[in-house]
Amino acid sequence: MSDVINIENATKVIKDRTVLDGISLELPRGGVYGFMGINGSGKTMLFRAVAGLIHLSSGSVSVFGRRIGKDCDFPPNLGLSLDSTGFWEDQSALWNLAFLASIRGEVGEPAARDALRRVGLDPDDARKVSAFSMGMRQRLSIAQAVMELPELLILDEPTNALDADGIGMVARLIFEERARGCTVLVSCHGEPQVEALFDRTYRLYEGRLADGRR
């Protein structure tokens, strides 16, 4: 089995607008890869392509030897945090994560409790998610992404709406995930604590890869 994520000439056109324009990358397993660029530069669309959430107009994505859309619909053992929505608003954070874990075949509540603690949320907080602040919602989104100890973790702007303590939590979590061998793809906007963990940084502009640096 291949030990790389291979993105080859990834192109996506939506209503005559090219949102991904021939991106090619090879990302070895176990690294932390940062993606930077202004809003609309293509970061989220690229992450969606790797996660199997969109079909490319042309090109391909293979994750550890399995071509997305051909060998599998989604990367196996994927942890994904793209936004802070999609939860059951009238239930608690613990209920949400325990339910998600159970339908994925995991032991629900223990995994959910551990994930909530890792992101600084109280597993016994009985408040409904509808009462959560944006920062708490962001933490919950990250918790569901790491709950099942993924092989590939994608974090799209995980520091949005977080204070300094929250940004530190994100940096610590990325460090821990890399230490156990997880491959991490993350986008952010100038948080030194997080950027210091990147093995390589890529910049996107208008759907194209602008540069990559060590």
Q: Predicted segments — roles?
A:
Residues 98, 109-124:
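Conserved ABC ATPase "signature" region
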Residues 153-157:
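Catalytic Walker B motif of ABC-type/P-loop ATPase nucleotide-binding domains
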Residues 51:
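Helix-to-loop junction immediately C-terminal to a conserved catalytic motif
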Residues 36-38:
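The feature captures the beta-strand-to-loop junction immediately N-terminal to the Walker
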Residues 59-74:
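Conserved ABC transporter NBD signature motif
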Residues 188-189:
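H-loop/switch region of ABC-family ATPase nucleotide-binding domains
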